[in-house]
């Protein structure tokens, strides 16, 4: 195969709607350009610096064909490795290189992987409201659109605060009460099952808001409502407690969106402590490690449900879909409808049809960035208060 030299790399941040989205663009001497997602929306400038100041000079002049070698070099070149900034930066380049290779092969990405194992991937979306009436309205809307899986949240992560008794002059932050959250969420499950029966599968994201003993109690209480899965019931630092949950509840568990390092998921998969791996593809370094992780999970009966939130470019979401139609153990894909500005910046962003997402048949990933449109939505940064989650006594808790 003829050498295809990398001639330029650019990192672009744009904020068409709520989130700062990061795209890496790799140009080659063949004239083929690739696009990849590097979104770490809480630290976008750090990722851009990593790409512009470190990866770009490292990669200019290298052969874009050698994706595996370039990935390994990017990961170890700084000596320190497997952190969210470097992984997202590497991911942007890695996805772009796969995009280039698929375009040169004149194949959609999933065909380059080895073809499809399914026609389409089932999707779930988010229904969130501070009241049950508002939640019912959203569920009804999504059922009409053909969704069979809906993530239901009463209020933001941690629930709807109700007369929280804080300390005097409380420290600034986003307060919630864990006992209120458990009680209200269990009641939410009960109400949804009473109203809808088994018309759809309920998913729920705890978002690591509980202590381990509370997580055990919560899992036991919601088990009777047969959730499709409970997500992030514990933070990554407390995964040893998953055995305790497994011993007391059969509720399906999904975990992984915060993982960066293979050591964070290997034992969970080998010991079958989770039913679904929820890794964020750019957070683990892109397509190259995601394919390896998917096949590793298959050996142990663990299914794939990649993290796919709104703070991800449609390029990254399209990569998830290509992975999902290829990997036999893919279970479901998260999806939140794109707003008009995002669709303008990322033409061809896919939307579900009757509860399913279909992989693009265009050569490559199938979604690119309109660089001119992206300039209309410059990056904005402010400290996030929702990640300053606090318990009533004022102590910080994992967000």
Swiss-Prot record:
Q: Return the Pfam families for the record.
A: MR_MLE_C (PF13378), MR_MLE_N (PF02746)
Instruction: List UniProt keywords, sorted A-Z.
Output: Magnesium, Metal-binding
Asked if the Swiss-Prot or TrEMBL record annotates the protein with the keyword Cell division, the reply is: no
**One Gene Ontology molecular-function label:** magnesium ion binding
Q: Which residues bind D-arabinonate?
A: 207, 257, 278, 307, 334
GO BP annotations, alphabetical order = amino acid catabolic process
* Keyword Cell division assigned: no
Superkingdom of the source species:
Bacteria
TM segment ranges: none
Q: Which residues bind Mg(2+)?
A: 205, 231, 257
**Signal peptide bounds:** none
Question: Which residue stretches, if any, does this entry annotate as coiled coil?
Answer: none
Function of the protein: Has no detectable activity with D-mannonate and with a panel of 70 other acid sugars (in vitro), in spite of the conservation of the residues that are expected to be important for catalytic activity and cofactor binding. May have evolved a divergent function.
**Family according to the record:** Belongs to the mandelate racemase/muconate lactonizing enzyme family. GalD subfamily.
Task: Identify this protein by name.
Answer: D-galactonate dehydratase family member A1Q3065
Organism name:
Vibrio campbellii (strain HY01)
């Amino acid at each position: 195969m003829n050498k295809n030299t990398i001639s330029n790399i650019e990192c672009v941040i744009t904020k068409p709607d709520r989130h700062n989205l990061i795209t890496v663009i790799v140009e080659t001497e063949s004239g083929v350009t690739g696009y990849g997602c590097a979104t770490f929306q809480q630290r976008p400038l750090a990722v851009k610096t990593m790409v512009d100041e470190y990866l770009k000079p490292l990669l200019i002049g290298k052969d874009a064909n050698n994706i595996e070698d370039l990935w390994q070099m990017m990961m170890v070149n700084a000596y320190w490795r497997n952190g969210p900034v470097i992984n997202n930066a590497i991911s942007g380049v890695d996805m772009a290189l796969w995009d280039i290779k698929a375009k040169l092969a004149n194949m959609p990405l999933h065909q380059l992987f080895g073809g499809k194992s399914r026609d389409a991937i089932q999707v779930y979306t988010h229904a969130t409201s501070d009241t049950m009436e508002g939640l019912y309205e959203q569920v009804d809307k999504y059922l009409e659109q053909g969704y069979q899986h809906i993530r239901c949240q009463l209020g933001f992560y941690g629930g709807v605060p109700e007369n929280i008794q804080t300390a005097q002059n409380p420290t600034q932050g986003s307060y919630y009460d864990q006992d209120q959250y458990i009680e209200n969420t269990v009641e939410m499950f009960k109400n949804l099952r009473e109203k809808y029966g088994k018309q759809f599968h309920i998913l729920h994201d705890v978002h690591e808001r509980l202590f381990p003993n509370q997580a055990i109690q919560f899992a036991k209480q919601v088990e009777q409502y047969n959730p499709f899965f409970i997500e992030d019931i514990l933070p990554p630092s407390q995964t040893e407690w998953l055995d305790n949950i497994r011993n007391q509840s059969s509720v399906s568990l999904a975990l992984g969106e915060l993982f960066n390092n293979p050591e964070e998921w290997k034992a969970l998969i080998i010991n079958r402590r989770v039913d679904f791996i929820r890794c964020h593809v750019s957070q683990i370094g892109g397509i190259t490690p995601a394919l390896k992780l998917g096949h590793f999970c298959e050996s142990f009966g663990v299914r794939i449900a990649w993290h796919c939130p709104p703070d991800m470019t449609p390029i990254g979401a399209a990569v998830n879909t290509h992975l999902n139609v290829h990997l036999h153990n893919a279970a479901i894909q998260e999806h939140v409808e794109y707003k008009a500005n995002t669709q303008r910046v990322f033409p061809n962003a896919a939307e579900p049809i009757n509860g399913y997402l279909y992989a693009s048949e265009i050569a490559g990933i199938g979604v690119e960035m309109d660089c001119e449109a992206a300039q209309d939505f410059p990056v904005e940064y402010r400290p996030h208060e929702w990640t300053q989650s606090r318990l009533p006594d004022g102590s910080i808790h994992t967000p």
